[in-house]
C-alpha cells in the first residue's frame, strides 16, 4: 500500500473555517489520502466535494472527551452517516473504563457499530489517560464489540501516539483489526515507526509534509 493511503488528513480545530476545510479536501484529492477527518458540521461539505473520488469522509463522535451519553453518540453517528460520512472515529467514555464499567464501554461501542451499519468504526481509547492494563482492556472491548479499528488519541488530551502503545494495541487485537496512530506525528520517520509497530492508519494534520 502506498504511503498516502495510510493517512487520514485531519483538521479538527474548532476555529477551522470553510476555506480551511476546502483546502484540506483539495490536498486529500491531490495526494490521494485515505480520508479527510473533519468535525461533524463539515461532513456534508466534505461529502459533496469527495463523492466522485476514492477519498473517504471521516468524522468524530463524542469528541474530544468521550463523556456524552451513549444515546447522544448513537444519534451523532446516524446524522453523520446521513450527511455522507464513510468512517466514524468515536471516543470511548474513558471515565467509565477507568471505573471498571466494562459492560458500559462495550455496549456503547456495540451500539455505534450497529448504528454505523456498513461504515468503518474506529475506537479512540485515549492512551495517554490509561494504564497498560486499561489499554489492553479498551482494545479487547473494542474487538468484542465489533469495531474495525482501535485508535490511540484525540490529539486534544495530554499526549499523542507512541510506538510502544501501537505495538501493545496490535498485539492485543491481532491481525484482524486496524490500528490507527494519531496525535503528535509530524515527520515521515515518525509515521514509518508507527507503521513498523503495527499501525495501519495514521491520523495527522500535516499529511502533505508526511508524503512530500
UniProtKB/Swiss-Prot annotation:
Keyword Protease attached: no
Top-level division of the source organism's lineage: Bacteria
GO terms, molecular function: deoxyribose-phosphate aldolase activity
Residue positions of the active site: 89, 151, 180
Protein EC: 4.1.2.4
Pfam family for this entry, one: DeoC
GO terms of biological process kind: 2-deoxyribose 1-phosphate catabolic process; carbohydrate catabolic process; deoxyribonucleotide catabolic process
Keywords from the named record: Cytoplasm, Lyase, Schiff base
Assigned GO CC terms: cytoplasm
Catalytic activity: 2-deoxy-D-ribose 5-phosphate = D-glyceraldehyde 3-phosphate + acetaldehyde
Transmembrane portions of the chain: none
Cross-referenced InterPro entries: Aldolase_TIM (IPR013785), DeoC (IPR011343), DeoC/FbaB/LacD_aldolase (IPR002915), DeoC_typeI (IPR028581)
Top-rank EC class of the record's enzyme: lyase
Location of this chain's protein in the cell: Cytoplasm
Family: Belongs to the DeoC/FbaB aldolase family. DeoC type 1 subfamily.
Protein task: Catalyzes a reversible aldol reaction between acetaldehyde and D-glyceraldehyde 3-phosphate to generate 2-deoxy-D-ribose 5-phosphate.
Name the record gives this protein: Deoxyribose-phosphate aldolase
Protein source organism: Clostridium botulinum (strain 657 / Type Ba4)
Species classification: Bacteria, Bacillati, Bacillota, Clostridia, Eubacteriales
Amino acid at each position: 500500500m502506498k504511503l498516502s493511503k495510510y493517512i487520514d488528513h485531519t483538521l479538527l480545530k474548532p476555529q477551522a473555517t470553510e476555506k480551511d476545510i476546502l483546502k484540506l479536501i483539495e490536498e486529500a484529492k491531490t495526494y490521494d489520502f485515505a480520508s479527510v477527518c473533519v468535525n461533524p458540521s463539515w461532513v456534508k461539505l466534505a461529502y459533496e466535494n469527495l463523492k466522485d473520488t476514492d477519498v473517504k469522509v471521516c468524522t468524530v463522535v463524542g469528541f474530544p472527551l468521550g463523556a456524552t451519553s451513549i444515546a447522544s453518540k448513537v444519534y451523532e453517528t446516524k446524522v453523520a452517516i446521513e450527511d455522507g460520512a464513510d468512517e466514524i472515529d468515536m471516543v470511548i467514555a474513558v471515565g467509565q473504563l477507568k471505573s471498571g464499567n466494562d459492560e458500559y464501554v462495550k455496549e456503547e461501542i456495540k451500539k455505534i457499530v450497529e448504528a454505523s451499519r456498513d461504515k468503518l468504526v474506529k475506537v479512540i481509547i485515549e492512551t495517554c489517560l490509561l494504564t497498560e492494563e486499561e489499554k489492553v482492556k479498551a482494545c479487547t472491548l473494542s474487538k468484542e464489540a465489533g469495531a474495525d479499528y482501535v485508535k490511540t488519541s484525540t490529539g486534544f488530551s495530554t499526549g499523542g501516539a507512541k510506538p510502544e502503545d501501537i505495538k501493545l494495541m496490535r498485539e492485543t487485537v491481532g491481525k484482524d483489526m486496524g490500528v490507527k496512530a494519531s496525535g503528535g506525528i509530524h515527520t515521515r520517520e515518525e509515521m514509518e515507526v508507527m507503521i513498523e509497530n503495527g499501525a495501519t492508519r495514521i491520523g495527522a494534520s500535516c499529511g502533505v509534509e508526511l508524503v512530500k
